[in-house]
């Protein structure tokens, strides 16, 4: 059992290291936007990375890296040829926000002690005797439950309600 003593640093007791933050990187944020865009505009034909990048205001080079991760995860596929581009590998109703974020970010655990992997040694070794592990596991479960329940087709509908005509509102689109 791990016994914690009074500490001037409560973060240490909670298993939080300096720099730990519960927020998504630009990979997750931009990748989710790109997937919504791709789902919306590739219903009839493949979509180029350039057109997604222009509509979303994302660097084409950075978007290529994100699409490579999404392709590796089996969420998108490339179509070769003159009218090629990218399309979804599955129906939007079969792709969750959780699938997308995990493909881009890896684990969504708020802190490493939410899950200790005995095979790799990843996480907090003291987690078995740590009272706060329960808190982090509950938060982790809530995050995963939430992102797994939101499906890409719901976000497409939301996108259409915000911008019904589908016209690009980014000034870079007309360039």
PLM features: what roles do these ranges have?
Residues 75-83, 87-89:
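Beta-hairpin "wing" of winged helix-turn-helix
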Residues 50-56:
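A short alpha-helical element within helix-turn-helix/winged-helix DNA-binding domains
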Residues 31-43:
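Short amphipathic alpha-helical interface segments
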């Amino acid at each position: 059992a791990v016994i914690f003593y009074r500490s001037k640093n409560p973060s240490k007791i909670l298993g939080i290291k300096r720099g730990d933050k519960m927020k998504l990187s630009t990979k997750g944020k931009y990748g989710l936007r790109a997937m919504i865009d791709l789902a919306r505009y590739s219903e009839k034909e493949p979509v180029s990375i350039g057109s997604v990048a222009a509509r979303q205001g994302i660097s084409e080079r950075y978007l290529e890296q994100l699409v490579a991760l999404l392709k590796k995860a089996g969420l998108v596929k490339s179509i070769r040829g003159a009218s090629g581009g990218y399309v979804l590998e599955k129906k939007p109703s079969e792709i969750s926000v959780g699938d997308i974020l995990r493909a881009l970010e890896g684990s969504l655990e708020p802190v490493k002690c939410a899950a200790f992997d005995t095979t790799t040694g990843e996480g907090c070794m003291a987690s078995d005797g740590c009272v706060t592990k329960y808190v982090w596991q509950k938060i982790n479960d809530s995050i995963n439950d939430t992102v797994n329940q939101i499906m890409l087709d719901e976000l497409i509908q939301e996108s259409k309600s915000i911008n019904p005509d589908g016209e690009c509102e980014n000034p870079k689109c007309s360039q």
